[in-house]
């Protein structure tokens, strides 16, 4: 299914290229309609950033359309065969049952909090021979709370697609941060979101798309630190990354380390020891502070390992 979907996507890319002009005209027409609606509900004083808003809106519409087309083509075999993205090995045996327990446990926590009971359930005897209650700090994972238990299987597949969308959108933010064209951002985001690794790993382990979502915005945060010594964004994202998974954070940290070294070495403005060590110390401090924000995930993870 996956390789057939990738083949269909390759054909679609080659077919769509000659129609880029038609697509641009349609994109412009949609943006003009939305701008008229925007002009009705806002005042002139509130439209100071109109050009920037127009550009971002045009890009977001274009990216969304491209993503939907590519997603339909890639996952068409699943749709035709009435299949879900639940892998029969880990997905059916681990991930979906964990989601069921999660959407049952979180409401219970809030009920206990509002009733003044802080003696939370910490162990679940209905999981195999018994296990600690698993809580995910991944923001996307919490979207499962929007679905009823009867819809979890469909929600599982839907949120995997959402992760693909967010991965491409994250790459879009990186490309646009460097002031590249919309075409460059479209190309990079679609190729990134539907890369071989993303298709292969994401359809089996949806959480493996989380580091793909975080990496591009971590690079943006690193770039802001290198250029302007602004470390706040990197600190927050390190904390969020650690909350999602310490494993994903350390893998992304390796990529960020390589990026930092190459950025310093390949940029004449920063190619000196003073800048290298100065920015390096700021990064280390930012990482320590960010890790402090997300350290609760380490306690819960290693607590589970030590008690298993």
Model-assigned labels for residue ranges:
Residues 54, 58, 62, 148-155, ...:
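Membrane-interface starts of transmembrane alpha-helices
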Residues 1-8, 160, 207-211, 252:
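Alpha-helical transmembrane segments of polytopic membrane proteins
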Residues 70-168, 190-212:
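Membrane-interface coil-to-helix junctions
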Residues 16-27, 75-88, 176, 205-206, ...:
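Juxtamembrane/interface segments at transmembrane-helix termini
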